[in-house]
Structure formats: structure tokens, C-alpha cells
Amino acid sequence: MFTINAEVRKEQGKGASRRLRTANKFPAIIYGGSEAPIAIELDHDQVMNMQAKAEFYSEVLTLVVDGKEVKVKAQAVQRHAYKPKLTHIDFVRA
């Protein structure tokens, strides 16, 4: 089982996302279920190491968002065109 630490995003938009990526983080979102969507930010290196394993895409993951655990599955992963970097992930509540 994978456990990923996340923080709720305070800013949104292109400029805020670029600042996150410069700080070695990237934006993501959690949606689905009866709760409202949550915009989050993740540590790039931590997630990059986890997503190298095939189980990352098929198993239920645990996101710890500000101390609260959320069970999710990776829905869509966006990558940089030619660099080995993640730019965004969509998570669906499990």
C-alpha cells in the first residue's frame, strides 16, 4: 500500500502551478464520491518513486491531506513532454 503526504493548495492557476513545480512539487486533485473536489499539492520526488511501480496505478492509495487519510485511485497522470517529470495527477475517491 502506498501512502502519500499532501497539502491543500492555497492558490490556483497557471502562475501558482508553475511556482509549485519550481519548488519541486506539483498540483493534483481529488474528486468523486459525495464530497467536494479538493485541490492538493504533492512532493514530486516522493510520487515519482512510487509511480515507477505498476501497483501505483491499480491499487488503492492513501493520501494524507492535512492529517486526514483519504483512500483514492490514480485516474489520470500528466507528464512533461520530454523531461522525466509529472505535471498533474487526478485521483478518484475509492
UniProtKB/Swiss-Prot annotation:
Pfam families: Ribosomal_L25p (PF01386)
Gene Ontology biological process terms, A to Z: translation
Single GO cellular component term: cytosolic large ribosomal subunit
HAMAP family reported in the protein's UniProt record: Ribosomal_bL25 (MF_01336)
Job description of the protein: This is one of the proteins that binds to the 5S RNA in the ribosome where it forms part of the central protuberance.
Family: Belongs to the bacterial ribosomal protein bL25 family.
Protein name, per record: Large ribosomal subunit protein bL25
Species of provenance: Salmonella gallinarum (strain 287/91 / NCTC 13346)
Lineage, highest ranks first: Bacteria, Pseudomonadati, Pseudomonadota, Gammaproteobacteria, Enterobacterales
Gene that produces this protein: rplY
